[in-house]
Amino acid sequence: MATAEVLNIGKKLYEGKTKEVYELLDSPGKVLLQSKDQITAGNAARKNHLEGKAAISNKITSCIFQLLQEAGIKTAFTRKCGETAFIAPQCEMIPIEWVCRRIATGSFLKRNPGVKEGYKFYPPKVELFFKDDANNDPQWSEEQLIAAKFCFAGLLIGQTEVDIMSHATQAIFEILEKSWLPQNCTLVDMKIEFGVDVTTKEIVLADVIDNDSWRLWPSGDRSQQKDKQSYRDLKEVTPEGLQMVKKNFEWVAERVELLLKSESQCRVVVLMGSTSDLGHCEKIKKACGNFGIPCELRVTSAHKGPDETLRIKAEYEGDGIPTVFVAVAGRSNGLGPVMSGNTAYPVISCPPLTPDWGVQDVWSSLRLPSGLGCSTVLSPEGSAQFAAQIFGLSNHLVWSKLRASILNTWISLKQADKKIRECNL
């Protein structure tokens, strides 16, 4: 029988409308976020006790943060702790709500007369609002945020930091939007917050993402909304109305775990012409692992054993798992073209070129007979990424890792540029 975890909880650091934050005396730099059985709307102008909401909110946040972390998004989340709390790195919160919208609805329509409900934003529209309950969280411009000269955990919030949060908001929305699609749910909009990790001094996604944080429409139908808007829309709060709201929240909590899995399988099979190319192939396998894609290595030569090459091909075609073949053959590459001419599956040639004959050898991968769709990628890591992009069309987990990688590359360049500029001062 499992025993309940005992934490050495210190003082209360913060209390909001729906959660409390406590220090953890035995874990410096970590805090406990405890959810409440409370639901609010209109900056708590409407407020009700909702039994079980804390557990529902905690489950949703824990699953969403796990999904984002596994994708590669920097997130203030360590692990779930019991039914109603989770442990996270301690952050100094930036008092801005970042809103990302795919579909125009709600307050956006009030602030932008003439825009019809249902208008779609490409790319998603990012807005920011200063957290100030007394003034109903006024909308801010990026310039206002920069002019405020906020400093949290020693980090001054300037143009670079604002750009990072803006780009991260869009990436996070797109990952969650893509993740809800297999459940036939449209993510209409969402709001998130960032903080500065007091230990690493990095900007990270923080606070919570639960059913209070977004609009979620099954089948893209507003009348089926399952988010907190169903509570806001109540003309009068009754026990029956609250029960309906709770059922909506439970519906989301039941499905959010499904976002951590994908019904679409995927696999990369690397065919090498010789074990002398094993090092090259292992780089491909390692890169596939970074995208969560299973990868198998096989040895076969299309020149010396074409019958065995085609038998291996048939083996993988026969089990029904979506597969991308990567052909690794030096000198004259017959492996990629032979595979491409005999399978409807994608084939990528990734020849291990050598300094002496590489310039000549590469033409066996580039100049092919008509009717072959074999692509050529020279980088082992690049061939794995290309395979991931193929699978990402139908697998939201792979796509999420690709999207987070794009964001993280952009952030690293932005931070490198900031560092260089500071050195020039």
Swiss-Prot record:
List positions binding CO2. Answer: 332
Indicate where the modification Phosphotyrosine is found in the sequence. 22
> What are the boundaries of the region AIR carboxylase domain?
267-425
SMART domains in UniProt: AIRC
SUPFAM superfamilies membership = N5-CAIR mutase (phosphoribosylaminoimidazole carboxylase, PurE), SAICAR synthase-like
Region span, SAICAR synthetase domain: 2-260
Q: Kindly provide the name given to this protein in its UniProt entry.
A: Bifunctional phosphoribosylaminoimidazole carboxylase/phosphoribosylaminoimidazole succinocarboxamide synthetase
Q: What is the lineage of its organism?
A: Eukaryota, Metazoa, Chordata, Craniata, Vertebrata
